[in-house]
Amino acid sequence: MALDSVKHLPIHGVSAFSSVTVEIKSFFSTVKPRKTSTFVYAFVVTFVALTVFLAFSPSPITVALAPSISSYVLPNITVSNSSNSSPSSLDSNFTTLRTPAPENLTAVTKNLTFESPVANGTTDTNAKTITIQFQTGHAKENISCPDNKTARDLDTHGARKAPLSEVLAVNSTASPKRKQRRKSSLRKVIESLKSCEFFEGDWVKDDSYPLYKPGSCNLIDEQFNCISNGRPDVDFQKLKWKPKQCSLPRLNGGKLLEMIRGRRLVFVGDSLNRNMWESLVCILKGSVKDESQVFEAHGRHQFRWEAEYSFVFKDYNCTVEFFASPFLVQEWEVTEKNGTKKETLRLDLVGKSSEQYKGADILVFNTGHWWTHEKTSKGEDYYQEGSTVHPKLDVDEAFRKALTTWGRWVDKNVNPKKSLVFFRGYSPSHFSGGQWNAGGACDDETEPIKNETYLTPYMLKMEILERVLRGMKTPVTYLNITRLTDYRKDAHPSIYRKQKLSAEESKSPLLYQDCSHWCLPGVPDSWNEIFYAELLVKLDQLGGKRRRKALKDHRS
C-alpha cells in the first residue's frame, strides 16, 4: 500500500515508480540465489520508497536533502540553468527565485515612471535561475537586479531611490497581521479615492483639526501666522474639506515623507504657492521624531523675498522646496532710447530658476494673482515677445501665451517617466469694499460662505489654463481648488497679518488687510490633503502599471 501511495505522482507525465521498476528488474536478472534476490529486492524497494517520500516531502529538512538524492534515482527531474550553474547553488530553502551575483548585474532598460528595473519586471538574461519543475509542473521565472544606476535614479547620498510606484508598501517592521491590516485598510482608502471627485463637497467641522497646533511651527511666515498676530477666533482652523463621494484621508506626514524619501518635492509659483509650501513643511516637520534633523538648506531664516528656498528632512534624505516665479515666465527689463529702463514681462521665456528645478521628482506649479494687478490688467507697453514690446495686449491673451510657453517648456524638459507634475488652480480673494490696495477688507468674516450663489463665477483664466493642460504631451494633474476655496472668506489674515504695524498703518489699521493669502493652520492644509490623496492614487496607478508590465514580461 505504501508503494501505491506514491506510484501515481507524475513527473513530467511519467510514473516515477514504473521507471524505477524497470531498472530493478534488470538488476535482479543477474542475481541467482533466491534468498539473496529476495533480500536485495526488499532492500532496494524500501530505499526507493524512502527516496520518493523524501523527494516530495514539504518538510524543510527533507526538502534540503531532495536535490542530492533525486539527482541519482529520479532522472526525470530537470534542472534548468541559464548560466551553467550546478544544483549545489540551491540553498537550504530550495528556493526558485535567485538574485544574480554582483558581477552579473547588467543594465537592460531605463527605469519607467519612478520604477527600478526590478520593480517593472525587467529581467537579466544572464541571471542565474534554478527551477525545480516537479514542484508545480511549470517553470518559475527569475527576478533579476540590473545595475542601472544613473544620477537621476540615485539620491543625494548615492543610494538607489526606491521606485515611487513602490512607496505605498506597508512598514515591514510591523507584525505580519498588523502589516496585512494596514495594507488592506490602505487598499480600501485608495479604491474609494479612485472613483471620487475631490473638488465637489462641503466644509465640515472636525474638532481633531488642525493638523498641527497653532504656534507650533516656527517656520510660518509672519503674514500667515494669524493666531500669533492676535486673531482671537479659532473655529476657522477646525474645518476640513469633505468630498461628497468619499472622505479624504487625513494627511499622514510620516507616510508622505516615506513616499518622497530621497527625492525633491518642489513648489513653483507665487506667494499663494508659498502659502501651500509652508503648510506642507509644517505638517511634515511635526511628524518627524527629531525636528533638529529638519533644517533650512541655505541657513536663511528670512526667506520671503528670496527667489528660492529649501527645507531638508535629513532622516529621509529629501527636500521640500519653493521657487518664486509669480508669472511662471520671466520678468524683464528693456532700455528706452533715452536710457531709462522699463519693466516688461517676457511671454516667450520661462522663469530663470527653471534650470534648477527641472529634474525634481514632484513639481507643483501655480500662477494667477499677479495677473490681476493693475499693470498686467492694462497690458500697455508691458508684454514682450522677442524684441517686440506690445503696445497693448489683452491680459487673457497674455496669460494664454505665458502658459503655452510654460507648457512647452514642461514638455521639453520634464521627463514624465521620472517626474509627476501638478498644477494648483486659482485661489480666490475676498476683499470687500475695494481691492488689496484700495481699502478692501475681510476682518469681520468669521464664517465661510454657506450659499453657493455668492461664489465668484469661474474665471476665464482657469478655463484658459485647462485648455493649455489638455494640449500638453506631459500628463499634468490639475488641483482645481478654486471653487472649494471660494467658500472660505473667513480664513484670511485680514488685519492679523503682522504683529507690529508701521506708524501709518497704526493710524488706519483697517485699511491694510490681507484677504488673498491664508492663515496657517488653515485652508492650504486642505489643499495639501487633496494633493496627498492625488499622490496616493497616482502612485497606486504607477504601481499597477509596473505589476501589469511584470506579468506581461513573465508570460512572454
Curated annotation (Swiss-Prot):
The chain crosses the membrane at residues 38-58. A motif (GDS motif) lies at residues 269-271. A motif (DCXHWCLPGXXDXWN motif) lies at residues 514-528. Not expressed in trichomes. It is found in: Membrane. Belongs to the PC-esterase family. TBL subfamily. This is Protein trichome birefringence-like 1. The gene is TBL1.
